[in-house]
Regions:
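Hydrophobic alpha-helical segments, chiefly the membrane-spanning helices
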Residues: 386-391
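Conserved N-terminal phosphate-binding loop of PLP-dependent enzymes in the Aspartate aminotransferase
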Residues: 2-376, 380, 384
Length: 391
């Protein structure tokens, strides 16, 4: 990296840009990577070097970089009607069309769609929806939010409190009332001799004990990712969601699927909640909704919840919440085209086609004598503890 070259892109970055979620010691020693463009699965830096972006722009770019159809849709909308809000009963026609499409694609009987600019904002919005609904229904004490250890739901004050990661202690979070149930990572947390189904049943019992300890009438809702992405791509143990669903319904606790990462094909289904049989009341979406070409988040409300929220909002004369760019027509046009690309170009089928081959080749790589690092589950008598950060 040209961190010592005067006026290099790297030096300019280090003087002007504050990077989040970045080891600043390593950044100062090695410098940043400054990117200029992308094409397909590759991104290119200022020196012309290309990289396979295996993380897909933080799970965003489901259609790859430089997809001409999506770019054309964005440009056409920019020429027609580049930006507007969804306040005061006004909205762009493209946003109405997108809402209809999301309702069509939803895995449940959907009511309406609410728009934000990110997954964090969408999850935060649902918290306020829950609080308003319970308060208006005479249950103002129902404010506690249940998530899980190693969960990731965002970076706002509320969603960082929901995120089950230790680093949020730097901000004095979580706030009171944000509870973290067990992480459904069977390999790491399963007991000796315990099957996956037994593990899932134990976690369900623990969840019910948590609810009873806190008081069922104090719980506003539970959020869960189909696969815990930032927590380590943790696939839920067999039978996990089937085990916890009846408990949530028993105590009338709304269940929210955070599909910010898993939604729109990442798991080989349009929704991760379908693949793992979550059956949520609300879906939160972002990222692949626009294939990474425009910031957007969406809350898809199940009809029963939506009807209840609309009723109390009418009583209050409004739902007093919103974002200036939420439901932006540019984002809506991009999302409509991105969803068409996912369907028309067979992205779901391709995920299912290549995933088995990818895993087979990954295992084969582990057998190669020059493989630098290959990991697989160690014997059950190992500690299964995390490697130290200094490793």
């Amino acid at each position: 990296m040209d961190t010592n070259v005067s006026n290099s892109w790297e030096q300019r970055d280090m003087q002007a840009v504050f990077h989040g979620f970045t080891d600043l010691g390593t950044l100062n020693a090695e410098g940043p990577v400054i990117l200029t463009h992308g094409d397909g699965i590759r991104v290119f830096d200022v020196h012309g070097k290309s990289y396979i972006d295996a993380n897909s722009g933080l799970w965003n770019n489901v259609a790859g970089f430089n997809h001409q159809g999506i770019i054309d849709a964005l440009c056409a909308q920019a020429r027609k009607f580049p930006g507007y809000h969804a306040f005061f009963g006004r909205v762009a026609d493209t946003t109405v069309a997108l809402s209809e499409k999301l309702i069509e694609l939803s895995p449940f009987d959907a009511g309406k769609v609410y728009y934000t600019n990110s997954g964090s904002e969408a999850n935060d919005t649902v918290v306020k929806m829950l609080w308003m609904l319970h308060r208006r229904n005479g249950q103002p004490q129902r404010r506690k939010i249940i998530t899980r250890v190693n969960a990731y739901h965002g970076v706002t004050v509320a969603t960082a409190s929901m995120t089950g990661k230790a680093y949020n202690a730097e901000f004095g979070l979580p706030l009171p009332g944000f509870l973290h149930a067990d992480c459904p990572h069977y390999w790491r947390f399963g007991l000796e001799g315990e099957t996956e189904l037994e593990f899932s049943a134990r976690l369900a019992r623990n969840l019910e004990e948590l609810i009873l300890k806190e008081g069922p009438d104090t719980i506003a809702g539970m959020f869960a990712e189909p696969v815990q992405g930032a927590g380590g791509v943790i696939v839920p143990a067999e039978g996990y969601f089937e085990a916890i669903r009846p408990i949530l319904r028993k105590y009338n606790i709304p269940f929210i699927a955070d599909e910010v990462i898993c939604g729109f094909g990442r798991t080989g289904e349009m929704w991760g909640s379908v693949k793992y049989d979550m059956q949520p009341d609300i879906i939160v979406a972002s990222k692949c909704i626009t294939a990474g070409y425009f910031p957007m988040g969406a809350v898809i409300l199940g009809k029963a919840f939506c009807d209840a929220l609309m009723k109390v909002s009418e009583e209050a004369e409004e739902f007093p919440h919103g974002f200036t760019a939420g439901g932006n027509p540019l984002g809506s046009a991009v999302a409509l085209k991105s969803l068409a690309v996912i369907e028309d170009e067979g992205l779901l089928g391709n995920v299912n086609k290549v995933s088995g081959r990818f895993m087979a080749r990954l295992k084969k790589l582990g057998e190669h004598k020059y493989c630098l690092l290959y990991t697989s589950p160690s014997p059950r008598d190992r500690t299964r503890s995390r490697m130290p950060s200094s490793a």
